Structure formats: structure tokens, C-alpha cells
């Protein structure tokens, strides 16, 4: 082949190669967008994986830090606690800890000016104060005897009557820095002898006052709203107690002029339900109003205090507790009386706690309780505005030393109401304001006053009639004599109120059943029958003579009782001699 042909052949080959390369470039150029998108997608995927790896690494690092902190926390030495008892300007404090008094350094993070005596503080292993906490909320209970002159310390009595002087912590201690200690909102001024305090005897601090229901429930301070006009059938007894109580308070100058000593106390005795407690409350109310009038003050703003002592609840199984409660009661009375306010200390069921010494069957508590009361009553001699009133239905069981002149000077018997007194009592509950039945009103020409008076007269005649239906008991005396007692012999103001309430309930039921409103005399008659029949089973006692004494029947000893009730639910008469159930007293 000629050189020219060879040259052409090489050129053609080179041209074909160029064409092939151009075609390849064209194909690559055509495929480049797809490749770019593929690479971008891969980059996005790698970015997401990288982000997840970074989050995982960060979380692992945080867990590692938390675990390291937990390891460090678990490896810390234990902290101690103490009670702050002193603060100094050089960032040091006195702390009572582990039974020792120590002077320690405070952490720079603690502002010592904000610390208070008695506050709990936390200590590190180097005994440095690193944290201030609250005051102790648990501890022993002590009884406040008195607050010392500096106002920051108090004398408290602990177990076994052990006396101890303690600091007043927290809000109690702040009062010492105040100028006006008579501020009624001051915590210390609210403290009074007999209060229970939370005490740490080792550190010597009292933290707060703890209300104890056992004492607060025994002494109920109140201003009674009972007036003499609310009491019926006891005009003579009210006059007696007004002479004994109100005259010495209202006319002190005359008593001093005649050298007459006011009575220290009054005993109200008589059967249950006859108004002894009502009279005592009315005395406190009336006395406050009279003194307010004498001072030129508004009678509506008159103040008096009626300390109602629940006799049986005063008893306590622990030795010395009952006597302590009695001391608290009279301390409270002296406190109130020192303000110039009349104070009535009323002991209800006095025979339950102040029995004749030596008469106890299972205990001899009265041998110490009675002398405690005697000393307190004698202590009232130099104290104004206080009088003791006792109430009992077994005055024969009260220790004679309490009843002697000079202690409970005045003794007033609250007897069961007679027919006239019963009418007076009924008039307190049956008034013209009550809705009366049209038929009963028509009998008196629509005169409500006349209708009410007639109702009262008829119901009293029914109650006090010595009829067969009103026979209650046949008693046999030790000498063999027998006597029939009627329901009128056991009537009381409480029974009269119950009869009227029963009649009102019958009137309400009558309205609901018949639609005819108003109280009728028949409702009262039905109430009397039901009241009498319910009392049939009440004189159940192992000792008929004791039951008779409580019920107000005195005289010859009773050895046998037989019921004679013939009401609508009664059957044959029933003898009562040695019943096992004591039952409720009339």
C-alpha cells in the first residue's frame, strides 16, 4: 500500500476515534444530571447520619456527665445537722450538734443576718455551715409556766413536773426586739400559762405553740346569749343568784362600807333538766350588761366570759393531770378577770369530780383533786371579777369542805316546776307566733293570745292531774310505807320543751298528711301520752334509792320501785328492784 493510502487509513482511524470519544462525551454529558442528583442524595443521607451520630454522641456525653455527678454525689461524706444558738459578726455561729455546743464557720453563700435562733442548719464534713433550714417540727411537749422578764425565755414544765428554762425560737423570739409587747397580734402575748409548747430540751429551745384539744375542749370561753327572760318558772331562784352574784359586782362600795365579803361561789343543785346550766349562763350575760351600763358603755358590746367545765372529761388516768387541768382553768380565769371582765367558772356535774374524799370505790383521785380545787377557790379571795358556780344533782356526794361557808357560800336548790311554773315554762315555747289550727282558733273567736293561754292551761292541767293515767311509780320505803308518785313529781323544764317539740312535729306531719296547717291542743295531749309512756323503762337501776336521789326524791330510803304506767303502750305494771342496766335518769 502506498504511503498516501497508509496516511489516509491512519487519519480515518484517528477520525473514528475522535468521533467515538465525542460520542462518549455526549453520553457522559447526557448522564451528568442523573449523577449529580445521585451524589446530592448521597450527600443528604450522609448529612442525616452525621446529625444522628452527633445527637447520640451528645446524649452519651450528657449521660456520662450525669453518671459522673451521681458518682460524686454518692461518694460525698454524710452531712450533719444542728440547731443555731448564736450568731456573730465574723461569719461564725454557735451550733448545738451531736450533744455538743460548737462554734463553727459559715459558708460565704450564707447571709448570717438572715439566721434566727433555734433554726436548723446543715453542716458538711468539715463542720462548716452550708445551708439554713426550717425549725424543728417534732420534739417533746412541755407546758408553759410563765414567760420571763426578757420576753425571750420561758419557764416550761416537762414530764414528772420537771421545770426548765428554754429560749423562745423563731417568731416567738422576735417579740423581744419589739417596743410594744402589748400588741395583740404578737405571738408571745398570745402565749399563756398552761399552753403546750414544742420543746427540744437538749438544745434548750421552744419552737411553737401546740394546740391540745384535751385542754381547749375542757374550757369553753364564750359570751352566753341566754337572758333571764328565756328561763321560766325559776323566778325565786333567779332572784337569789342575782343577789349573790350581781350585787357584789355592781355595788362594791356598799359591800366595803358594810364590811360584807362577796361570796366566792354558788352551788346550784337539784334534779336534772331543771335549768341549772341556763341560770349560770344567764348570770354571765346579765352581769356583763349591768357592768357595761354602769360604765356608760353600750350593752350590746358588753363582754363576759363563761368558762364551762365539762366535769367528767376533766378526769384523766394519768396522775396529776386532773389537778393540772384545774390549775389551767383558774389561770385562764385570772387572765380574763385581770382585764376587768366578769368571769364565771362553771363546773357542771360537780359531783363527778369533787366527791367526798375516801368514798371512791376503784380509785382515790378525789383525795388530790378536791384539795386542788379548795386551794384555787381560796386563791380567788384577792381576785376580783371571778366567781365559781357549781351544778350537781347529787349534792350529797360533794366533799363537805367545798360546800362550807367561805367557798361555795350560796346554795340554791333548783326544784322541779309546779303547775304555775310549768305554765311559765310552756309560755316560752308556745307563743302567738306559731301557726295555730283554724278549729282551735275558732273556739276563741280568732284570738291567738286567748287560744295559746287556753292551750297552756289545758296541757298543764292534763300533766298535773292526779289521775289514773298519770300514775308513774309506786315506791316502797325502808319502813314498809308505800307511796304512789305521779309524772308531775318528775316533771322538768327539759321534759316540757320535749313535749312542745313533739307536738310541733305532729303538727308538721298533719300538714303533710291532711294539708290542714296549725298546732292543735290534741297534738299536745298526744305528746304528753308519748312522753309519759317512753319514760316507763327509764328508772332501771341496781339501787332504787340512788336513782330516787338523782331524780330529786329525798327522804326515807327507798328499797323497791314498781312502775304503774298505763299509757297507750303500757301493759301490766312492772317491778324494778335489781335491774342490770343503769339506764337514763329522768
From Swiss-Prot:
InterPro entries: AAA+_ATPase (IPR003593), AAA_ATPase_domain (IPR050168), ATPase_AAA_core (IPR003959), ATPase_AAA_CS (IPR003960), NA-bd_OB-fold (IPR012340), P-loop_NTPase (IPR027417), Prot_ATP_ID_OB_2nd (IPR032501), Prot_ATP_ID_OB_N (IPR041626). One of its GO terms (molecular function) is ATP binding. This is Proteasome-associated ATPase. The gene is arc. It holds the Pfam family AAA. Homohexamer. Assembles into a hexameric ring structure that caps the 20S proteasome core. Strongly interacts with the prokaryotic ubiquitin-like protein Pup through a hydrophobic interface; the interacting region of ARC lies in its N-terminal coiled-coil domain. There is one Pup binding site per ARC hexamer ring. Upon ATP-binding, the C-terminus of ARC interacts with the alpha-rings of the proteasome core, possibly by binding to the intersubunit pockets. ATP binds at residues 273-278. It comes from the Bacteria. PROSITE patterns: AAA (PS00674). SUPFAM superfamilies: P-loop containing nucleoside triphosphate hydrolases. Residues 585-586 are annotated as: Docks into pockets in the proteasome alpha-ring. Residues 11-76 form a coiled coil. Pathway: Protein degradation; proteasomal Pup-dependent pathway. SMART domains: AAA. One of its GO terms (biological process) is proteasomal protein catabolic process.
Amino acid at each position: 500500500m502506498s504511503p498516501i493510502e497508509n496516511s489516509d487509513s491512519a487519519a480515518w482511524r484517528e477520525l473514528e476515534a475522535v468521533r467515538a470519544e465525542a460520542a462518549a462525551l455526549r453520553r457522559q454529558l447526557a448522564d451528568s444530571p442523573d449523577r449529580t442528583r445521585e451524589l446530592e442524595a448521597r450527600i443528604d443521607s450522609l448529612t442525616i447520619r452525621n446529625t444522628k451520630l452527633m445527637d447520640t454522641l451528645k446524649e452519651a456525653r450528657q449521660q456520662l456527665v450525669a453518671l459522673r455527678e451521681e458518682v460524686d454525689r454518692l461518694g460525698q461524706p454524710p452531712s450533719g445537722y444542728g440547731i443555731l444558738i448564736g450568731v456573730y459578726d465574723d461569719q461564725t455561729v454557735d451550733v448545738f450538734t451531736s450533744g455538743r455546743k460548737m462554734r463553727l464557720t459559715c459558708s460565704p453563700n450564707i447571709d448570717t443576718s438572715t439566721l434566727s435562733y433555734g433554726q436548723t442548719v446543715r453542716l458538711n464534713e468539715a463542720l462548716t455551715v452550708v445551708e439554713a433550714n426550717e425549725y424543728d417540727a417534732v420534739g417533746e411537749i412541755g407546758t408553759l409556766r410563765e414567760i420571763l422578764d426578757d420576753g425571750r425565755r420561758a419557764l416550761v414544765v416537762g414530764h414528772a413536773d420537771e421545770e426548765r428554762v428554754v429560749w423562745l425560737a423563731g417568731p416567738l423570739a422576735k417579740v423581744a426586739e419589739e417596743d410594744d409587747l402589748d400588741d395583740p397580734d404578737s405571738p408571745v402575748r398570745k402565749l399563756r400559762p398552761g399552753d403546750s409548747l414544742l420543746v427540744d430540751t437538749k438544745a434548750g429551745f421552744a419552737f411553737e405553740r401546740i394546740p391540745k384539744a384535751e385542754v381547749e375542749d375542757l374550757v369553753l370561753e364564750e359570751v352566753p346569749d341566754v337572758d333571764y327572760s328565756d328561763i321560766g318558772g325559776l323566778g325565786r331562784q333567779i332572784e337569789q343568784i342575782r343577789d349573790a352574784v350581781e350585787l357584789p359586782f355592781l355595788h362594791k362600795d356598799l359591800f366595803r362600807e358594810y364590811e360584807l365579803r362577796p361570796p366566792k361561789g354558788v352551788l346550784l343543785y337539784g334534779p336534772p333538766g331543771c335549768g341549772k346550766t341556763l341560770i349560770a349562763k344567764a348570770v354571765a350575760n346579765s352581769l356583763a350588761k349591768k357592768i357595761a351600763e354602769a360604765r356608760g358603755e353600750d350593752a350590746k358590746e358588753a363582754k363576759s366570759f363563761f368558762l364551762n367545765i365539762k366535769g367528767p372529761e376533766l378526769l384523766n388516768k394519768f396522775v396529776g393531770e386532773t389537778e393540772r387541768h384545774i390549775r389551767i382553768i383558774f389561770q385562764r380565769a385570772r387572765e380574763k378577770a385581770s382585764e376587768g371582765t366578769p368571769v364565771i367558772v362553771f363546773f357542771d356535774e360537780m359531783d363527778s369530780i369533787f366527791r367526798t374524799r375516801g368514798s371512791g370505790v376503784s380509785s382515790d383521785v378525789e383525795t388530790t383533786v378536791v384539795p386542788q380545787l379548795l386551794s384555787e377557790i381560796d386563791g380567788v379571795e384577792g381576785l376580783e371579777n371571778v366567781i365559781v358556780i357549781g351544778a350537781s344533782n347529787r349534792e350529797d356526794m360533794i366533799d363537805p369542805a367545798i360546800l362550807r361557808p367561805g367557798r361555795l357560800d350560796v346554795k340554791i336548790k333548783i326544784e322541779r316546776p309546779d303547775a304555775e311554773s310549768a305554765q311559765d315554762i310552756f309560755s316560752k315555747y308556745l307563743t302567738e307566733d306559731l301557726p295555730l289550727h283554724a278549729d282551735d282558733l275558732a273556739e276563741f273567736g280568732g284570738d291567738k293570745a286567748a287560744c295559746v293561754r287556753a292551750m297552756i292551761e289545758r296541757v298543764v292541767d292534763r300533766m298535773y292531774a292526779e289521775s289514773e293515767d298519770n300514775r308513774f311509780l309506786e315506791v316502797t320505803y325502808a319502813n314498809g310505807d308505800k307511796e304512789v308518785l305521779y309524772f308531775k313529781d318528775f316533771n322538768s323544764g327539759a321534759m316540757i320543751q320535749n313535749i312542745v317539740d313533739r307536738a310541733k312535729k305532729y303538727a308538721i306531719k298533719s300538714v303533710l298528711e291532711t294539708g290542714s296547717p296549725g298546732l292543735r291542743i290534741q297534738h299536745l295531749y298526744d305528746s304528753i301520752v308519748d312522753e309519759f309512756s317512753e319514760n316507763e323503762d327509764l328508772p332501771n337501776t341496781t339501787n332504787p334509792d340512788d336513782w330516787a336521789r338523782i331524780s330529786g326524791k329525798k327522804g326515807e330510803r327507798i328499797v323497791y320501785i314498781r312502775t304503774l304506767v298505763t299509757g297507750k303502750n303500757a301493759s301490766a305494771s312492772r317491778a324494778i328492784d335489781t335491774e342490770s342496766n343503769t339506764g337514763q335518769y329522768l
